[in-house]
Each structure stands twice: as C-alpha cells, then as structure tokens.
A protein has these predicted regions:
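Phosphate/ribose-phosphate-bearing ligand recognition and processing surfaces
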Residues: 84-176
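Glycine-/small-residue-enriched capping loops at alpha/beta junctions
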Residues: 1-111
Length: 176
C-alpha cells in the first residue's frame, strides 16, 4: 500500500474519533490544560486525570500512553511540544517537535495500534506557526511510515479548514 493511502486529513473534533489512538498535546507536568488537552480530559473522564497525576511528568519530545477511558479511541498517547521561540533555538525546537511525533508513533507500533490521529501539536498555546509545525509533522510521519513494518493509518485531525487543506495538499504531493 502506498504511503498516501495511509494518510488522511480531516477537520474534526479529535475526541469524537473512534480509532485505536488519539494523540494529546500535553504539558510536561501532565496537569489539566486547555485546548486539545482540556477537550480530551473532559471527554475521557476523571480516570485519565488520575492516571496522568500518578505519571507526574513527561519531558518535551517524549510520549506516554494511557487508556482512552470514556473516549471512543482505545488509547491516548500524550506528548509534550517545546514552546516556540524561533531564532537561534529553532533547529533544536524543530528536532524536539519531530521527536513528539516519532515517539508517539513508536508507542503506537509497540502497542499494535493501527489507526492514530494527531492534532496540530504545539500550534495552540505553545505558539508554533502552523506551516512550520505541519511540515515537521508530515515529514516525520511519512518517514516513519516508510521505515515501519506496521501498516498503520495516520489521520491529521485539524481544528481549522486551512490546516486540513495544508495537510491534504502535502498528501496529494506524496501521491504524485
């Protein structure tokens, strides 16, 4: 199966997706936040909050997995992006954001997850420019799919139409 057939871009509420796993853009102390994190926690229920409180910490670029609890998704993979600063910090930050995607996909492979959805990690409160973050996300995901023996499908779940269209264009370019 070609790579493009294993990718999709949707404009949707990630908490409504009935797939194997969704990815959460968490903070390093795994404390309740707003945006995607707040929506996921609200829908998953108190059990998710309790589990993340016990876990206590996740470093930037790392990822951890929990059950989805009351979500339609079986699992939630939590990852922490760096806060965008740009300038001389940009290369290191880009590598860390790429690790968010790579480590989430690694956990997905290790847990036999075949369908996974990513939000636009880092583009909310962490202020990543959406075009920069999308390119990093897309390139990291495509690279992983090319190397992995696991035949998974990745959904880029976007809040805004413009973001969905950006991912759709990148998918079309891979399709040729």
């Amino acid at each position: 199966m070609d790579i493009a057939a294993r990718l999709e871009a949707v404009e949707a509420d990630i908490t409504t997706l009935a797939i194997d796993a969704i990815v959460n853009a968490a903070n390093s102390h795994l404390m309740p936040g707003g945006g995607v994190d707040g929506a996921i926690r609200k829908r998953a229920g108190r059990e998710l909050d309790d589990e993340l409180r016990r876990a206590g910490f996740c470093a930037e670029g790392d990822a951890l997995i929990t059950p989805g609890y009351r979500l339609p998704a079986a699992y939630v993979i939590h990852t922490v992006a760096p806060v965008w600063a740009g300038g001389k910090e940009r290369p290191a930050q880009e590598q860390t954001l790429a690790r968010c995607y790579a480590n989430a996909l690694k956990l997905a492979d290790e847990n036999n997850i075949r369908t996974i959805a990513f939000p636009s990690i880092g583009t909310g409160a962490y202020r990543w420019p959406t075009d920069v973050a999308a390119k990093i996300a897309f390139d990291t995901v495509v690279g992983h799919l090319k190397r992995s023996d696991v035949q998974s499908t990745v959904t880029f779940c976007c809040f805004a139409r413009a973001d969905r269209e950006r991912y759709a264009a990148m998918i079309a370019a891979v399709r040729g």
